[in-house]
Regions:
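Generic hydrophobic secondary-structure signal
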Residues: 27, 59, 78, 123-124, ...
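Short, conserved beta-strand/beta-arch hydrophobic-aromatic motifs that form part
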Residues: 39-116
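Charge-rich, low-complexity N-terminal segments
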Residues: 1-46, 138
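Charge-biased C-terminal accessory regions appended to nucleic-acid-, cytoskeletal NTPase
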Residues: 100-138
Length: 138
């Protein structure tokens, strides 16, 4: 979750389309302005972005991620996992949302954001992520 993870994340998206970089920048900027949730990076999948609640709001002993996302260059997609269920994600207009195959996955859904999503739907993703955080808070 340190500076190296952040650098790896930005190196991974350095050659992506500008709209992908803009999507991530919009999401990061939004959540880093808040004091009740934040964005952080890990080296998972070569560098990813995670949106989390601090421990005291998550009623947990450590931070809890309510969303994880990373760029898949081969598919030209942003792969997302969310605390929302597939049905709850569909309320925000996201199609093709599935239950994760890994039964030990703590997040409840996964979706691949294609070009129309990462070009035009950053705000919809932010709203869905805020709903996931509220759900996690109980």
């Amino acid at each position: 979750m340190g500076e190296l993870s952040r650098e790896n994340f930005y190196a991974k998206i350095a050659t992506t389309p500008r709209a992908v970089q803009g999507f991530f920048e919009t999401v990061i900027e939004h959540f880093n302005k808040r004091n009740d949730m934040h964005a952080h990076h890990t080296d998972t999948n070569g560098g990813d972005l995670r949106l989390a609640l601090p421990a005291e709001l998550a009623r947990h002993h450590t931070i809890r991620n309510f969303s994880t996302l990373y760029w898949q260059s081969r598919n030209q997609e942003i792969f997302v996992r969310s605390y929302l269920t597939p049905e709850e994600m569909s309320v925000f207009g996201f199609a093709g949302v599935k239950i994760p195959r890994n039964i030990n996955e703590p997040l409840n859904s996964e979706v691949r954001l294609g070009e129309l999503d990462w070009r035009y739907r950053a705000q919809d993703f932010i709203r869905a992520s805020e709903a996931a955080a509220l759900k996690m808070m109980g």
